């Protein structure tokens, strides 16, 4: 609603000087996939019903080297609707889609959304091979939750003296980053992640009437477990991992999502209800 930061928890002890929520930077896995689908939506050439290929892909990189990503399951899913690819976090179809728009388009979006970390110029960033703090991830998802506006996280509203006199006021610094129509369509896709995809277990504890939106993230060998999502009035990000980068065995859905769900249960939630713009239309699609 306003970018105000309610809490940032990431220290094992008080006053250690290192808060993982702010300072720890880890690979984010599939959390960045929504940006790829946003680029597709903004191009005007794709809808959530557009069929895309979830088949093997090989991308040349330096010299005679190449990058060959795999799905988490190791298999392929053939031709699938774009919505299914995001909801189930398919890697192959996502990389194929991302490659159509290029690295610079992807990197520029990250910077536009508030990422300040270094962004490698390699296609593996499409699947989250870039180090970010949970706070940076929060900044990205804040753009989605507000319908396309960037509210930098704010920890102080005002400063007053001992007598209550105002010394300084910190107002909102709002920037539009996504066209409202594209933001509305992306939001629908992220809601399907929660209804039928990798985030669906959240509804075992939270009412479906909240229309939650979010995305899980898992890095190679399950070293990092992430979940980022939002209701109508709260955005929350959870990371689980070990400081020595050892394997946790947790995916985003099995580790971070239950923690995220428990946090959201403790807060008063409002449903996600972004306004449908006049230039967005719904059509029935024959699945056959």
Residue ranges of model-derived segments:
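A generic secondary-structure signal for well-formed alpha-helical elements
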Residues: 39, 43-44, 48, 59, ...
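Mid-domain, small-residue-enriched loop/turn segments at the edges of structured enzyme/sensor domains
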Residues: 64-71, 102-141, 148, 152-155
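Periplasmic/cell-envelope proteins involved in peptidoglycan metabolism and beta-lactam response
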Residues: 1-32, 43-50, 104-110, 122, ...
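Second-shell loop/turn segments in exported
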Residues: 18-26, 68-73, 81, 92-98, ...
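Extracytoplasmic/periplasmic beta-strand context in beta-sandwich domains
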Residues: 50, 55, 123-125, 154-157, ...
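Cysteine/selenocysteine-centered motifs that mediate thiol-based redox chemistry or coordinate metal-sulfur cofactors
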Residues: 35-42, 47-54, 278-286
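A penicillin-recognizing enzyme superfamily signal
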Residues: 1, 5-8, 13-20, 32, ...
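Conserved catalytic neighborhood of penicillin-recognizing serine enzymes
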Residues: 2, 46-106, 150, 161-192
């Amino acid at each position: 609603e306003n970018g105000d930061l309610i809490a940032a928890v990431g220290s094992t002890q008080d006053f250690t000087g290192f808060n993982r929520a702010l300072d720890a930077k880890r690979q984010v896995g599939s959390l960045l996939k929504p940006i790829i689908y946003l680029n597709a939506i903004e191009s005007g050439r794709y809808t959530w019903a557009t069929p895309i290929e979830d088949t093997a892909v090989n991308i040349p990189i330096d010299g005679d080297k190449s990058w060959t990503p795999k799905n988490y399951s190791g298999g392929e899913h053939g031709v699938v609707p774009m919505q299914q690819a995001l909801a189930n976090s398919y890697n192959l179809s996502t990389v194929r889609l991302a490659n159509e728009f290029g690295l610079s388009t992807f990197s520029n979006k990250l910077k536009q959304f508030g990422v300040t970390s270094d962004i490698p110029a390699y296609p593996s960033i499409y699947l989250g091979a870039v180090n970010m703090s949970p706070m940076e991830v929060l900044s990205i998802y804040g753009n989605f939750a507000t319908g396309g506006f960037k509210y930098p996280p704010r920890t102080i509203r005002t400063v007053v003296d001992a007598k209550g006199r105002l010394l300084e006021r910190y107002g909102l610094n709002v920037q539009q980053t996504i066209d409202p129509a594209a933001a509305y369509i992306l939001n629908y896709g992220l809601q399907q992640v929660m209804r039928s995809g990798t985030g669906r277990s959240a509804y075992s504890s939270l009412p479906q009437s909240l229309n939650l939106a979010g995305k899980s993230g898992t890095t190679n060998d399950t070293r990092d477990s992430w979940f980022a999502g939002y209701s109508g009035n709260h955005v929350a990000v959870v990371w689980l991992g070990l400081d020595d980068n050892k394997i946790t065995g947790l995916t985003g859905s099995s580790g971070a999502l239950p923690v995220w769900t428990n946090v959201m249960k403790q807060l008063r939630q409002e449903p996600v209800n972004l306004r449908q713009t006049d230039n967005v239309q719904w059509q029935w699609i024959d699945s056959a």
